Curated annotation (Swiss-Prot):
GO MF entries: structural constituent of ribosome
The family this protein is said to belong to: Belongs to the universal ribosomal protein uL29 family.
Domain of life: Bacteria
Keyword entries, A-Z: Ribonucleoprotein, Ribosomal protein
Gene3D superfamilies for the chain: 1.10.287.310
GO cellular component, one term: ribosome
Protein known as: Large ribosomal subunit protein uL29
Entry-linked NCBIfam families: L29
InterPro entries registered for this protein in UniProt: Ribosomal_uL29, Ribosomal_uL29_CS, Ribosomal_uL29_sf
GO biological process: translation
Length: 69
């Protein structure tokens, strides 16, 4: 799932669901980085997109945390 799939509905999920999304993206990022180091990665643009998706979700989580205080 790349940024195109992260819509407002995903950002309206609970914090637990967003944290699960972050873990899923981090696992996928790890896999892509491993493939990159081995030399079998064909779509290197996905690494950048997933890193940005993780940042977007974490930004939303931090905004919620600061808003709750």
């Amino acid at each position: 799932m790349l940024y195109k799939d992260i819509k407002v509905s995903h950002l309206m999920n609970s914090n637990d669901e967003l944290q699960k999304l972050v873990k899923d993206f981090e696992a996928e990022l790890w896999t892509l980085n491993f493939k990159k180091s081995v030399g079998s990665l064909d779509q290197s643009h996905k690494i950048r997109a997933i890193r940005r998706d993780i940042a977007r979700i974490k930004t939303e989580l931090n905004a919620r945390e600061k808003g709750a205080k």
